């Protein structure tokens, strides 16, 4: 029996993989800026690019890229809005997507639903709400916290089937499968 030790290292990227990653990063920056809503409640489709990065590059690359994209977005594109908690949230979301999608040729409805549900619950409703309360001091007692979080829960309940549908279609698309075979094989 062969002794195989799984270590957490950054896999080397060839030129095509690196260029694809750069293109996905650029697309992510565009999609993350095309939001609807307020500072407290926003709808964005940046999860699309992060899902692809997680599927193709794995947990370490996707977490690093999520952190880089968050820092670039908060300091260069939208100066003055940086908070390290949101960077941590982006990394946790990337990790969840990677654990669900990386090294899976076909991604089931169940796997996509669990991944999206965990990201929406842990990252969007949980961590991001905590960071916003810390930043804006909006909830000083339980009733004000419930008033603050209720629209966030409703927004994420609405976004859940939308994100699951888009993610499932995207991750199981023939073009994506062909790209995976061509660039990552």
Swiss-Prot record:
Question: What membrane topology was assigned to this protein in its record?
Answer: Multi-pass membrane protein
Q: Where are the transmembrane segments?
A: 34-54, 64-84, 114-134, 157-177
Asked if Oxidoreductase is a keyword of the record, the answer is no
Q: Which UniProt keywords apply?
A: Cell membrane, Folate-binding, Membrane, Transmembrane, Transmembrane helix, Transport
List localization entries: Cell membrane
Q: Name one Pfam family in it.
A: ECF_trnsprt
**GO (cellular component) term, any one:** plasma membrane
Q: Could you cite one Gene Ontology molecular function of this protein? A: transmembrane transporter activity
| Subunit (UniProt) | In E.coli forms a stable energy-coupling factor (ECF) transporter complex probably composed of a membrane-embedded substrate-binding protein (S component), two ATP-binding proteins (A components) and a transmembrane protein (T component).
Which NCBIfam families does the annotation name? ECF_S_folT_fam (TIGR04518)
Q: Which purpose does this protein serve, as stated in its record?
A: Folate-binding protein that interacts with the energy-coupling factor (ECF) ABC-transporter complex. Unlike classic ABC transporters this ECF transporter provides the energy necessary to transport a number of different substrates. The substrates themselves are bound by transmembrane, not extracytoplasmic soluble proteins. Upon coexpression with EcfA1A2T in E.coli allows 5-formyltetrahydrofolate uptake; uptake requires both FolT and EcfA1A2T.
Q: Please identify the protein, giving its name as recorded.
A: Folate transporter FolT
Organism of origin: Leuconostoc mesenteroides subsp. mesenteroides (strain ATCC 8293 / DSM 20343 / BCRC 11652 / CCM 1803 / JCM 6124 / NCDO 523 / NBRC 100496 / NCIMB 8023 / NCTC 12954 / NRRL B-1118 / 37Y)
């Amino acid at each position: 029996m062969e002794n195989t030790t799984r270590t957490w290292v950054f896999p080397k990227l060839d030129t095509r993989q690196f260029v694809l990653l750069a293109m996905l990063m650029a697309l992510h920056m565009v999609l993350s800026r095309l939001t609807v809503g307020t500072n407290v409640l926003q709808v964005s489709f940046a999860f699309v690019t992060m899902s692809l990065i997680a599927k193709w590059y794995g947990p370490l690359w996707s977490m690093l890229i999520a952190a880089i994209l968050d820092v670039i977005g908060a300091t260069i594109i939208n100066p003055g809005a940086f908070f390290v908690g949101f960077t941590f949230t982006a990394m946790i979301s990337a990790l969840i997507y990677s654990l669900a999608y990386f090294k899976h040729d076909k991604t089931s409805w169940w796997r996509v639903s669990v991944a999206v549900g965990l990201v929406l619950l842990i990252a969007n409703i949980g961590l991001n709400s905590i960071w916003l309360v810390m930043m804006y001091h909006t909830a000083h007692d339980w009733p004000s916290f419930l008033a603050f979080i209720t629209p966030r829960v409703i927004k994420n309940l609405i976004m859940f089937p939308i994100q699951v549908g888009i993610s499932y279609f995207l991750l199981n698309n023939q073009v994506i499968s062909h790209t995976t075979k061509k660039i990552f094989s």
